[in-house]
Amino acid sequence: MSQEPSSSFSDGFMESDFSQGSFSASDDAELSIPSEFAESVDELSSSSDNGDQGQPLTEPNNIPIDEDTVYNIWGQVVGTRRKDIGPDGSSLDMFLERHKDTNEFFRTVYDPAKGYKRANLTPEEEEMIRNVMVSRPYNDAPGLSRMNIQSTLVNKNIMRTALTSDIVGPKEKYASKAIVRKIEKLREGIERGEIVYDPNRYKVDENRGLVVGNRDLWADVDETEDPSMRIPKGRGEMYMNPTKPKLPGHALSYNPPLEYLNIDGDGSQQKLQSLRQIKTYTNFVKDQFDRCVTLYLNPRQRLRKEEDMDSMLPTLPNRSLLTPYPTFCAMTIRTGTRRINGLTFSPKGMFFAVGGRDCILRVFETYSGRQVRAIPVLSTKKLEKKSINFLNLEINCCKWCPRTDVSIIAVCAGDELIFVDAGICESGNYNEVRERTRFLLNARPETTQPCPHMAWEMHAGVTSGGKSYASGFVTQVSSNAYNEGSEDDDAAESARFNEERHQRGHEGQIDADVYTVYTRLNQFVLLRIHHTHLVSFCNWHFQGDYIVTVCTDDKSRAKVTLHQLSKWHSLSPFNRLKSKIIGAHFRTKKSELIVVSERSSRIYNLLTGDKLSTLYPGVKQVTASGMGYGDNFITGSADSQCALFANAAGPEPTAKLCYHTSTIRNIDVHPCGGLVATCSDDGIVQISRIVDASLVKMHPGQFDEKLYNRMIPCVVLNRRRQAADGSVGISRVTWHPRQPWLLCSGTDGVLRLFK
């Protein structure tokens, strides 16, 4: 231990450390070594000295070195060179030796000491190999039993995978979840009394199959059985295995071997020259014929119920029974806009309104096609020359109020719900209808109750964020004049949404694409309800007091909103609607609301707010929905399927039709009858008829029972409107409220009225 420290070790300390007394030691002091390390120190010293007893560190130990073994610089074995094992005899000798004694052959190994020839293993070597295979110590293996690894493991890293096959897994101990659910249902049924145990139900008759009854194989078809079971009496009642005779042996042969001759000593067995010389040949033909008859009479396969494909299809009635429905185009109107997104008829059908991309609501007369009104509900002004990304504000939907005493059209344009006075009258005095309309929409700011994230803009002022600003110019019902003099004129003008600047920027930065949207109130536009996101759909209640709006944006805080005009109140009943909402419909006979999403439709009770049921159309994505004044609810999908829910009852549709080749864009149901119109991007309008109770009562005995609550296609309209590239499609369809007339609009801005 007198070696000097290496340079690398001594460089880490300074001479000042020793001089300052950090390591103080006297000359007489000795280094004390614990007793438990004394032996190891002696071994290290003996191995490190370069004397006669030890070996130098630079030389490897005296271990037997094989010429074919590869070592590293530390003397460790890292591999062996390829050895050419000599031939162990011919292949035939090898094969014979292997099959002579299989157990002894597989106990031999190649011994390198004997020139890589096969040598037998001793019992001790076999035991050693066997102990290594089962992970036992080979020195005292006979006295040890098989060790349990989990019992000897003392550290906290428990092995999750068992190394032995005697551990039973959890799946073999316990039953599956499906079996547990079935047993739980059976237990509940027994407790409720629905399942009654009958001990004789599954009792097997011991004599069953032993007694064969008489059957009439050649009888006619039983009249009491199902007509589709075209099986004679008794032919399909049971299955009989065909008779199989025993194969003849040597004793029955006409030319038996010699050892079978004269076995009994009576000379009955004899050797004949041909088969015809035996005694039983006289009945051979009869026996074969009887066997053929037996094989024919017994059924050769298990007969099944045969279904005729034509019998499964219902018999379609004559098209004359489905009338009336539109058959020809009576009028064509070119509006001048590119795309039309809103179509609606007045309550009596004398006028219809159209809205599209130009944000102008046009009102036409039904019988002449003359344009009566053109009301701009939204206008835009470009502030910059270059504009690429711009939010296209257009009319998404428009619905006419079903009340006949007022003239109101609800328009969804941008993020606003706009109430427009059409300025027409279908019955009664025009001035009275106009006064009622303005009185219904002339709300006061202090009495309105909008949602926290919405704002109501009226002629009397603005209500937004829980604050109301009154204006001095209030619309008078009698003289239609504006009186000024209110103190809140400036506050109302500052809060009024006359100018809204929509910027497509982030973090407050002004982008080059800037548009100014002008939304003003005039003699036709009486009320605006501002939402936070794009309003894509609206629908009236049949009484004309409630209206529901739908925002399809996923970031919208209120996807479905209810507005009541009589009380000037807004309500957002659903806070957690994760899926994308397509539309919403009121039920006519019940106070229920149907909310349509991409995958399903949910029915809610408006009085309690509870979810009553869920309708699953079974399609990938719902794109359109329709519901008339009845309870028949219809959905259309992106895969061109149309599903009917008769009376909106049951989670699954009662009927499905697939006559389109592209996505269905709109569906409308006639309010008076069961006519259904669907339009698609393929430029086709499909007219179908629902077989309901009224149609069956009108034509008794003409419709099959399988056709009840089904849709029957009547006619295909507007096939010529599809362009060569398929760019022209049908976007909207709507029915006349009192006549079987259909109005449809395309993506080219052309209206067609079918009668």
Curated annotation (Swiss-Prot):
Induction notes from the record: Expression remains constant in trophozoites and in encysting cells.
Biased composition (Basic and acidic residues): 496-505
SUPFAM superfamilies named among the record's database cross-references: WD40 repeat-like (SSF50978)
Name this protein carries in UniProt: Ribosome biogenesis protein BOP1
Gene behind this protein: bop1
Localization annotation: Nucleus; Nucleus, Nucleolus; Nucleus membrane
Biological processes per GO annotation: maturation of 5.8S rRNA; maturation of 5.8S rRNA from tricistronic rRNA transcript (SSU-rRNA, 5.8S rRNA, LSU-rRNA); maturation of LSU-rRNA from tricistronic rRNA transcript (SSU-rRNA, 5.8S rRNA, LSU-rRNA); ribosomal large subunit biogenesis
Family the entry assigns: Belongs to the WD repeat BOP1/ERB1 family.
